[in-house]
Amino acid sequence: MLARKDTRVKSDFSEIIISLASPESILERSRGEVTQPETINYRTYKPEMKGLFCERIFGPVKDWECHCGKYKRIRYKGIICDRCGVEVTEKKVRRERTGHIELVIPVAHTWYFRSLPSKIGNLLGFPTKKLDQIIYYERYVVVQPGIKAEEGLSYMDFLTEEEYLDILDSLPRENQLLDDSDPKKFIAKMGAEALEFMLSRIDLDTLSSELREQAHTDTSQQRRIEALKRLKIVEAFRDAKTRIANRPEWMVMRIIPVIPPELRPLVPLDGGKFATSDLNDLYRRVIIRNNRLKRLIDIKAPEVILRNEKRMLQEAVDSLFDNSRKVNTVVAEGSRVLKSFSDILKGKQGRFRQNLLGKRVDYSGRSVIVVGPELKLHECGLPKDMAAELFKPFIIRRLIERGIVKTVKSAKKLVEKKTPVVWDILENVLKGHPILLNRAPTLHRLSIQAFQPKLIEGKAIQLHPLVCAAFNADFDGDQMAVHVPLSHEAIAEASLIMLASHNILNSANGTPLAVPTKDMILGLYYLTKGRKSTPEHPVKGEGMTFFSAQEVIIGIDTGQVSIHALVKVKIKDKDEQGETIEHIVDTIAGRVVFNQYVPEELGFINELLTSKKLQHITSQVYRLVGTSRATQFLDDVKSLGFRNAYKAGVSFALDDIKVPTIKFELIEQAQREVNAVQENYLMGLITDNERYNQIIDIWTRVNTQVTVFLMQELEEDRQGFNSIFMMMNSGARGSREQVRQLGGMRGLMGKPQKQLQGSVGEIIENPILSNFKEGLDVLEYFISTHGARKGLADTALKTADAGYLTRRLVDVAQDVITTEEDCGTLRGVTITTSINKDEVAESISERTLGRISLNDIYDPVTNNLLVNAGEEITEEIAAYIESVGIESIEVRSVLTCETRRGICTKCYGRNLSTGKLVQIGEAVGVIAAQSIGEPGTQLTLRTFHVGGAASSIGVESNIQATDKGVLQFEDFNTIKTTNPQGEQLDVIISRSCEVRLLNPQDNRILMHKHVPYGAYLRVKQGELIEKGQEICYWDPYNAVILTSIDGEIEFHSIEEGITYKEEYDEQTGYKEKVIIESKDKTKNPSITVKGSSGEAINYNIPVKARLIVEDGTKIKAGHPLVKIPRVVSLSKDITGGLPRVTELFEARDPSNPSIVSEIDGFVTYGPIKRGSREIFVESKDGIRRKYLVPLSKHILVQDNDYIKAGYPISDGNTSPSSILHIKGPIAVQEYIAKELQAVYRLQGVKINDKHIEVIIRQMLSKLEVIESGDTTFLPGQTVSKFTFREGNDQLLDKKVVIDAGSSSVLRVGQIITARALHEENSNLKRDKLSLVQARDAQPAIARLKLQGITQASLDTKSFISAASFQDTTRVLSEAAIRGKRDRLQGLKENVIVGHLIPTGTGLPRYSKMIIGLREDYENLVASREKQAATDNI
């Protein structure tokens, strides 16, 4: 056998190109042909020669020993045995040497014709069905008509066997003897051979220009789509040619590679049986069929038998490559489907996710965790035995170094005996050697933290109580894993970055995570809570005055002063300017104790401590005095909290639960209201829907009132020292919801729903009036079980969804890394206060904190410069900006960052987990994904605790003034009317009325709201109103259509059974007319109101509307004609939440999207066409747009309404993609961020906007080409912004030839520079020939495309990352055709190929650094200078 070059790949490569393998390249890599299906000899257990495990091809089974045993030992290295032909080498070569199988006939690769879109099919223009007929030997295809072309037979015609034989009979005999290249010869083939023949003859360049021409000029939409589909594949091959040889005919194989035997092992089991990889079975089938076919051809078997055998060989190769797609899959015994190459790659158990992205780790252990209250924040307790096992190699080395033992073996024995010297050494080894603790599920980066281990007795790991929040751990049997960082770099990283004391802040929102909770907070609350003396309970030391804090502490220690006593103390404090002052304060003795531990930079904290307050204090401590003192503070506070909780002795008794006495009165009153609503319903005044909604509202209100009284009673009980109230109020345990159920009323319960959208009856309308103290009756208990079980079922089902959401988020954002300081962009986003239902959800100071200002910001009052452009907005500046009333600020944002790869630090701003500006090399994408995904998982587990009590979303039915101010209406159109209660009011009849509340002094806008159509006004334009005053109100349960004139009613096309049906309500005996969708599309129900002076207005009536007027009756202006019920009162829990988050990130269009106007203009109704109403919007400058609204939809606009761009014409949810196209990327980002924040805010989860922005940046990173111009892009193609810009830049100042004239150099359609054109024309002019005509090259036009996160992950630049995410086979086959290059720039692809990830110190710029001593460097510089000086002389 020839010596051959080493085919192993060096590990320091920087990119990977994937392409189709040519037969030559497979042969070049192969060590020999496998011709026998045998594996090993059943007697000797040695591999059979020429078989699948052959040693001659793949290398020896034992190190340095040939097959026959003639050469043994390393000294014969490299010799090839003359008897058996096996090279004497190591056995590990069996992991890398490949073989091959030479097939008798070509075979099509299943990936390229089975998986849709079929690559071979598109290239040749065959549908999949026809392709299958060729490949599986059912039809012949004409590949060269030859002389039969005259008889109408053409290229690519299909022939049955009879037709083929008839043609052969009719041919002249010599025709078949001609050479294949002779155009007169008739050739028809079947099977992959035909495809190979046709693919090899394709001229891609010609085909490309033909298809482009067709896509441009064809009138049929279908044929154009077809042409573009084919063009995509053609262009992929043409593009690949620029990087690597890639021929279409290589999609058909003549040679199959056989992978190394160690990668498909055959393992002997006990009892003489063997376990084998499925690939061996699949390979055997291929070899057996190939050999049989060879024999059949040799003995000249009949065509029928040959054809059947060829088909079977094709199927065998299909199942080797992909056994899951085929109808007739190959199965092992017990009907288990064999795992083919595709199955080995894809899925969670596939090569990518199981072995490359998730490896198992050595030097690790796991154990149960228990609390370690006396540990420092950076410490954890590690069981001795565990430590001895984990650090064994280190101990062995020290034992040998100290000369205690001589060999490793004896050292091992010593460690196993656990002699005292071992513990001594272990103590030393552990100094400065941190360990990592990890709690599954690892949802964010704080689930793995480093600690300094302390050796402890016992078998459980001790964990510091403050890190439980980050790990989401509790001590009910949780287990944690321990990992040992081995290398110096790993130890440095663990100690400097991952140590628990460095991870106090939460990267999702910048608030401290390591904050005392549970009993610690209860102890601190108890300590800082004051109590006044009463005759029964005198408080020691009340009213005393102390000279210093020390005196107070002596008083407490000696029992003279109670910790709850109100006292006066002289203390050091900070004034407004931050200067230290001394003064006397009224405080509580316990607070003086607490302040002993507070850094003096914060001054004296004179407040009752709750968990929120303590979180705020911790964050101030961290900011003002740094990490190490913050850690010290937390440890002190932890001990103080535990000590006082133990001293307080807070218990939980039945009598601590107080039931408010007023509860029963409130319930009776509510019962009366409910009866009144029921009466109204029975009299037919309201619909069933309204009745349900009103009842739910009554009970929701009563429940809230009862809760308020309950809280008051608890607070007044024992001066607020009621133990349940203390637990709840301090934030230690229990929520208002839970306490309400104990002592108030359980209230309304949710019931399980089949569908997600709330249909009527999402909430059971009979509330549970009892609480847990009084006890529930049987019916109430039964209703309760609904909710409780729903909670448990949700938890079980939704956790997987949340995990999958996190996985998709990480995948889409994994390559977002900060790569440069400043991208220099001039764009940014405008940030204002975020308002949610009249309340400030997030103030402008919270939203701008840690961002970089885009422009200089000046104080509006003094005109002083507050922040320079490009400077960070700090806490102080943010607070000041809010105080002076600046309403909006432009800041840098990830969305507008123009860094080509990754993002820049200025656009990102502050790193929330450190409170400083983000560094270069931070993996901000992964942090963003974790920050959004981690609460997602928490959201699913949240329902579990409330036990299914439903809280309904209050329905908005009025607008109240948020401040005192002057009213200003915009687009204001009203008519006078009387409301149902008989009051004289104005009613709004314009669609886009806005109300603003202005500050009378400086005309600042205090509130800005949309006023809905049909709202009754309580105020006048320009009126000065007070805070809380009602501006307008409307019916929250029904949309209405009002008449704007007095007159008589006339019905059109309102016919029973055709356009409306009468709904008979059995309980009330009333009938209602409800408009239905008519089968007869010409009938369009409408009502005309004829005025007395002859004018008439026509109103179109939508489906589901309920008529409240009769034909021929009189009506007054401003009265409703119909009511259209709105669907409201949905229960709000996270099941609504998680699917909503997914829907937003996947950018899915809602199930019933609203139709939105793209321009400002006046509405006119058009005719009805095909079940849709045409609606025109015409702007003032004459632009006209047409919209088709299905008749089943409620149209929100009437004739002649003036509406603005983005206003919905029909009801439904707005789709994010229409927001993008109408209002632009910033609007869609605001919409998605606002909707997401609303879901998370309901659960009390705070996520900083910048994380959401990072994900949205990835969703908006691509463009969709609309017109390709003269570029190589295709219409409808998705390209990245930078690729698109480059493509267009290449056409700058270029010309396109439209008539080549007499030029022999240029051809039509060629793109050339203006200079080349000028030169060519000069030459032609000189020779007096016709000149070349050319036009300017047209650039492509594209628009932003909003992709869902799954789509964006699959469209990432790196094919390795995409393949490891989803659709592995499709991604890889498309990448191979494109000859894709992966430059390994993201995290995932580097993990897969085993490189350092390009973040932090793994950035390429650091890899070439040389590290040494400063002295050496200075000496080197000095010697260089000396050398230079001597050279000059």
UniProtKB/Swiss-Prot annotation:
SUPFAM superfamilies: beta and beta-prime subunits of DNA dependent RNA-polymerase. The keyword DNA-binding does not apply. Keywords: DNA-directed RNA polymerase, Magnesium, Metal-binding, Nucleotidyltransferase, Transcription, Transferase, Zinc. Pfam families: RNA_pol_Rpb1_1 (PF04997), RNA_pol_Rpb1_2 (PF00623), RNA_pol_Rpb1_3 (PF04983), RNA_pol_Rpb1_4 (PF05000), RNA_pol_Rpb1_5 (PF04998). Disulfide bonds: none annotated. Transmembrane segments: none annotated. Binds 1 Mg(2+) ion per subunit. Binds 2 Zn(2+) ions per subunit. The RNAP catalytic core consists of 2 alpha, 1 beta, 1 beta' and 1 omega subunit. When a sigma factor is associated with the core the holoenzyme is formed, which can initiate transcription. Belongs to the RNA polymerase beta' chain family. DNA-dependent RNA polymerase catalyzes the transcription of DNA into RNA using the four ribonucleoside triphosphates as substrates. One of its GO terms (cellular component) is DNA-directed RNA polymerase complex. Its EC number is 2.7.7.6. This is DNA-directed RNA polymerase subunit beta'. Its cofactor is Mg(2+); Zn(2+).
